[in-house]
């Protein structure tokens, strides 16, 4: 799947508009044996990308000369995820599944505090870490038929929380702009990053394979995690693991799909029409305040691909709007166009010669 994004950010009277395009994910699934399936893929796990600054006046002398300070914030990097999953149906309607993933990547963040008065030192903080570790997810699903035309599906998932064996570091550089003299202090926290445990559940309803409606809930237990934090203790700087920087994140998702007749000879009756929406509470605390919550709305359709030997693959096109908002912080609106291709198993069918 490929995504095209248009990001609009606003803080007070300041506005920023940015565009980007990227490859979102590649996944595949196949049947290994009766009641046993396999899935694998490459998907993004986290993504960091920002560059902004703010300037404020801190002093005006008797000659009305202003002294200003500028804080510049830059972040880049992220984690990638490659996974291998298996699903097993021990009896009709009930399935178990497990995904084992490998995570890798790094992040770099910097905060540079400079002044218009060249006699005042510039303070730069550089945060970085590299991650190479695993992720484990398990789930179960049960489908019950309510009538000849209706069936309901219940599901649950659990993600294992654990430390990532990564050593985040912080470099603090104090430099005098006039003399160029600098002083550097380096901090490192051993095994300082971790994934939160997560648990979720979902409910789906299928009517005649025409109308499908689903709702999901996900709880990420961020409040139980700790994260490296730069503080002062008795006048001494320290970079240590700190709890209470996060709160649990709750995410609610709702979606629906309609296809009049997937086997119809009429093109528009085979079209898939989809809508979805989600809401997520903030998990990050910034200076004691809650970070941004997230609202997302999407709509799209699936176009059937028809040729002489395949009539079940689908070209998926959707539009998504995401808003992240927190009081007195940057408000971010993202508009994305997603294009993906779903291959049906007949693309990989074996030809037989009689």
Q: At which residue positions do the language-model features occur?
A:
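Subset of outer-membrane beta-barrel
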Residues: 1-354
């Amino acid at each position: 799947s490929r995504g095209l994004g248009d990001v609009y950010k606003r803080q007070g009277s300041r506005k920023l508009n940015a565009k980007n395009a990227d490859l979102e994910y590649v996944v595949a699934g196949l049947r290994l044996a009766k009641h046993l399936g396999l899935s694998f893929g490459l998907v993004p796990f986290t993504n960091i990308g920002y560059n902004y600054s703010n300037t404020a006046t801190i002093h005006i002398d008797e000659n009305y000369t202003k002294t200003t300070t500028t804080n510049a914030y830059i972040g880049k990097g992220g984690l990638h995820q490659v996974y291998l999953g298996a699903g097993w149906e021990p009896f009709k309607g009930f399935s178990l599944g497990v995904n084992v993933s490998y995570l890798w990547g790094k992040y770099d963040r910097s905060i540079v505090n400079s002044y218009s008065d060249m006699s005042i030192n510039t303070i730069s903080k550089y945060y970085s870490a590299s991650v190479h570790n695993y992720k484990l997810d398990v789930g179960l699903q049960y489908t019950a038929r309510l009538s000849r035309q209706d069936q309901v599906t219940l599901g649950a998932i659990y993600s294992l929380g654990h430390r990532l064996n990564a050593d985040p570091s912080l470099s603090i550089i104090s430099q005098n702009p006039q003399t160029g003299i600098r002083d550097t202090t380096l901090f490192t926290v051993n095994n300082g990053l971790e994934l939160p445990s997560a648990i979720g559940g979902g409910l789906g309803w299928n009517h005649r394979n025409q109308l499908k409606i689903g709702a999901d809930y996900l709880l990420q237990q961020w409040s139980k995690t700790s994260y490296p934090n730069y503080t002062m203790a008795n006048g001494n700087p320290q970079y240590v693991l700190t709890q209470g920087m996060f709160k649990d994140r709750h995410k609610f998702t709702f979606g629906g799909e309609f296809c009049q007749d997937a086997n119809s000879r009429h093109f528009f009756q085979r079209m898939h029409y989809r809508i979805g929406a989600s809401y997520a509470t903030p998990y990050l605390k910034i200076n004691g305040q809650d970070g941004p919550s997230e609202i997302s709305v999407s709509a799209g359709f699936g176009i059937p691909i028809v040729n002489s030997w395949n009539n079940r693959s689908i070209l998926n096109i959707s539009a998504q709007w995401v808003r992240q908002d927190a009081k007195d912080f940057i408000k971010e609106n993202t508009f994305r166009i997603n294009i993906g291709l779903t291959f049906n198993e007949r693309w990989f069918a074996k030809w037989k010669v009689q």
